[in-house]
Structures are given as C-alpha cells and as structure tokens.
C-alpha cells in the first residue's frame, strides 16, 4: 500500500517552492493518484501507444520518469527485438526509488535510469519519447528547444507523448475546470488546507500552457500530426508524430 501523502496537512509558516525531494518521493504514488484525474488511464494508454510505435533496435525515452510508472507500463507492452528504454530524472530521491522498482521485475526489454537534467540528455534513434507531466516544470523559455531536440532525435514516424496540466484562455472555463479539479482532490481526501498550501507551493514552479500553445509549438518544430488523446478537467495528454 502506498504511503499516504500528508506533506501539506499541517499549517506551514513559510511555504517554499515545491520540489521532488525525498519527502515527495516517499508519498509520490499516493500524491499523484489523488491529485491528477485520469492518471492511471494515461499510464495504461502510454503502454498501448508504446506497443504500437516502438520499433526494433530503437530507443524509448521517459523524460522526467519520477518513480517509473510510464517506464514500467511501456516495458510491459513493448515486444520488439533490440528496443531499450531510457528513463531520466533530475531528482536523486526519485531515481534511487525508481531503480529499485524497475529492478524488482524481470523483462526482456532493458531499462536504464539516469540521474540527469532532461535538457542535457542526447535523444538518439528514438521511436517513442514520453514527457509525462514534465514539460510544465521547465522554464517556458526552455520548452521549445527541448522539443526541437526530441524531434531531431526521433525516427520518422516516431511519437512524442506529452501529458500536461492545461490553462484555458476562456476565463470562465478555466475557473470551472480548476474548481472541478479541486473537487476531485476533496473527493480523494485532501483538506482545504492541503489544497491551498500545495497550490501556493507549486504555482511558481509549474507554469502550464494552453492546448493551442502546445499545438502551435509542435507545428513550428515540424511534427506532421498532433492531437489531444485524453483529457479530464484541466489535465490531459497529447501525441505528436514526426
């Protein structure tokens, strides 16, 4: 059973910026399930997409892999000779726990977990690249360059899977979707204090884009096709095909 997320359950005098440290890594499975609507569906479908798009003797990347949920889903689904998965995260606490989880299961598809900044990783001969709720934590000025790098490293016909929290230009729609997300968190046992303090901690480090911004970026970089394939409230996932 996952350790319960109680990080923001008591009043904090000075709320610092949210970081993926040891405390977060310890409760991350509980936190993510109770915070992101549709997370399990996204993880399952990432495996389905990887099964469809992974090619023999190619690389599959999970950039910002955290505890390896997407990596494990893809490893269970990929059945291609010579295909390997490379997971990358810059949190030592996440990487340490991720390696333990990966090594707990045997598979014919090799997995390497790297502790590194995803902006510094070479993307080579890739058939599948996953950014699962990762891009939104990068400085907006760095996002286009990372996606260009991914595009350059993808094989023709390769797929990028990008899951993100979204903002919406229509103010009424945006507020409604935020409220529904908070209702989702309340239904999963988070208190008003927890919701408020988590929002204060994360608002300066997670800066979401609109769906239109994502699509425009994909188009400018050269992806031939992109679309939202899953959305629940203001969270969703897109694909972009080279």
Curated annotation (Swiss-Prot):
Catalyzes the conversion of S-adenosyl-L-methionine (SAM) to carboxy-S-adenosyl-L-methionine (Cx-SAM). It comes from Aliivibrio fischeri (strain ATCC 700601 / ES114). S-adenosyl-L-methionine binds at residues 39, 64-66, 89-90, 117-118, 132, 199. Its EC number is 2.1.3.-. It holds the Pfam family Methyltransf_25. It catalyses: prephenate + S-adenosyl-L-methionine = carboxy-S-adenosyl-L-methionine + 3-phenylpyruvate + H2O. GO terms for molecular function: carboxyl- or carbamoyltransferase activity; S-adenosyl-L-methionine binding. HAMAP family: Cx_SAM_synthase. The keyword Transferase applies. This is Carboxy-S-adenosyl-L-methionine synthase. Homodimer. Keywords: S-adenosyl-L-methionine, Transferase. SUPFAM superfamilies: S-adenosyl-L-methionine-dependent methyltransferases. Belongs to the class I-like SAM-binding methyltransferase superfamily. Cx-SAM synthase family. It comes from the Bacteria. One of its GO terms (biological process) is tRNA wobble uridine modification.
